[in-house]
Amino acid sequence: MKTRTLLLSSLFAAAVAFAQSPAKTNTASASANFPPIGGIHAHVCGIHFYSGDMARQIIAEHYCSHLSDEVLQCVLYDSNKPGARLIGVEYIVSAKVFESLSPEEKKLWHSHNYEVKSGVLTAPGMADAAEKDLMKALIGTYGKTWHMWQVDRGDKLPLGIPQLMMAFTADGQAKANIIAERDKLYGSTAAKKMARADIADAKHDPGADGWQKGVAVQLDLKTVQATAQQLRRSE
């Protein structure tokens, strides 16, 4: 209950900070008639890598809304500027929800403990105290992330099938140039790490971050036989 209350209060603080930002003020009227978009109340920036290929790392801007006190949903963009490309989605669930998932399902999810403690995860534009409260709420959660647009390889369109993404779990995994690029946008990752040193580590479910065991999960495209019902409808 304490964690749930903290998550809700942190999300409220994020909503207030986001609502007061110039970007939100300027676009509020434009999104007023689009309730799902109007429900976005937090902006978080993280760095993902392709499951099975840590060499491919990408900064992702998350714009999030909450479905309940246990589930968040985020749309992901490749920048925070007008004309940004929508590259994916991330679903975030509480530890309680994650524990209820099957072993096979858990392989698709990543933990957020290291992202929070390392400073890799940040909430742009939010006051330091409010951001820290949000990170305390997120540290024990788990994310399931799909990227549909592989902008890192120069694709001009969202080509191919969705790609499962993962998050860092230890020092030395994030590329120095990626961290430097993100630091130019939102301040020192190292400073955030120091400021969060007193945040307690979350209990880690071994079902998440399966790639650490040496076997990563990724999608593959296959051809399936159309059903008789589908064929009849096409006639």
List each language-model region with its residue ranges.
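An exposed acidic His-Trp-rich patch
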Residues: 80-166, 170-172
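Hydrophobic h-region of N-terminal signal peptides that target proteins for export
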Residues: 11-19
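N-terminal domain-onset segments
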Residues: 5, 20-71, 82, 135-235
